């Protein structure tokens, strides 16, 4: 599985999937040139408070 998939599944298991996708959109706006995998990792960290 890809890293993005793992992050989405983990967020889903913690009931944070929708919040993850909302945060991904925010991070994309703030950092439009950041690689997608990094965007998801940053959003996951923000949502899960890690």
List PLM regions with ranges.
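C-terminal alpha-helical interaction appendages
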Residues: 1-50
């Amino acid at each position: 599985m890809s890293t993005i998939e793992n992050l989405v599944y983990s967020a889903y298991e913690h009931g944070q999937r929708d919040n993850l996708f909302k945060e991904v959109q925010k991070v994309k706006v703030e950092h439009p040139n950041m690689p997608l995998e990094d965007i998801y990792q940053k959003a996951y960290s923000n949502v899960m408070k890690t």
